[in-house]
Structures are given as C-alpha cells and as structure tokens.
Amino acid sequence: MLGGLLVLCGCSPKSMPDSDLIGLKFVSSGTMARPEFEGSVRMDSAGVFVLKAMKENYGPMFEKQITAEDMKHFREIIEDEKMYKYKDSYRPRMQVMDGWGWSFWAKFADGSVIESHGSNARPDGNGLGKVHGYMEQLIQDGKQIEFPEE
C-alpha cells in the first residue's frame, strides 16, 4: 500500500546506495568570507583517491592521497549515521541572517548522489561532525597546496 502511494506521488524512499563511494565533499561556513572548513575527496585520472582539506578552521588547503579503505570508512559513516536520509535543505523556523551554513555531497559508483545543505539548521545525529573529523584526521600529514598571501 505504502509503495503504491509513493509511486503515485512521485516520491521514493531514501536508501543507502549499494555501490562504492567515489566522491565526497563537506563545507561549513560562518560569517567570514571564506569557508570555515572545506574538504573533498575525488578520484583522479589514475584512479587514486585524493583528499583536499583544511587542517584547521579558516586555514590553507592541503592535499593527500587516501586509500580505498579510507573511502569505505567514509561510506560506513554515511550508512551508520543514515546520512542518505538527509533532507535536501535545512532551515530554522525563524529567519536568521548570520551567514552560518554547511553543505554535504557524496557520489557513488552507480551514479547515485546524496546532496544536502543547511543554513542555521542541521540534521539530527553526528554524521557531518564525523565526516569533518575524519577528513581533519586524514589530512594532518598532507602537503600544503594553498599559500595565504602575507
């Protein structure tokens, strides 16, 4: 019965993709001009996963190759924290104009994509915090690729 209702309204239940995670991005921003934290993982032309992220808030970008096992760990976070159920957008009930926001994107080998963002509101759980924390942990021995102007 529920399945029939979902088909009629054009909705589909959100479920975890069955394929491997091949890309990931998390950005949080405050009231400053640049992101508070930014991290992304992409597969390069040689099939190697490359993490680009900040070691600290508002810091320069660093780069590091990561393993397929690291990508499996990110995938486990997404699954365990049910991040695949995130709404497209999160906003508070009352308008807040302080500029704080975040965005999350994950791509899987079968073409599935999870995308979500928010302004002054976020989903329940600690999925975003765990993704952020694991990116920071991995990038600590990365090579600096962005140099602030002095």
Q: Where are each of the predicted segments found?
A:
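Sec-dependent bacterial lipoprotein signal peptides
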Residues: 1-9
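Short amphipathic beta-strand/extended segments with alternating polar/hydrophobic composition
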Residues: 38-42, 62-66, 111-122
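N-terminal post-signal-peptidase region of extra-cytosolic proteins
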Residues: 36, 59, 88-91
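A short-motif feature that recognizes glycine-rich, charge-decorated loops
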Residues: 50-86
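Short, well-ordered, aromatic-rich surface patches in folded extracellular/luminal domains
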Residues: 11-31, 77, 84-150
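Short, low-complexity, polar/charged sequence segments that are solvent-exposed and flexible
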Residues: 42-48, 60, 70-71, 123-126, ...
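Post-signal-peptide N-terminal segment of Sec-exported extracytoplasmic proteins
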Residues: 31-57
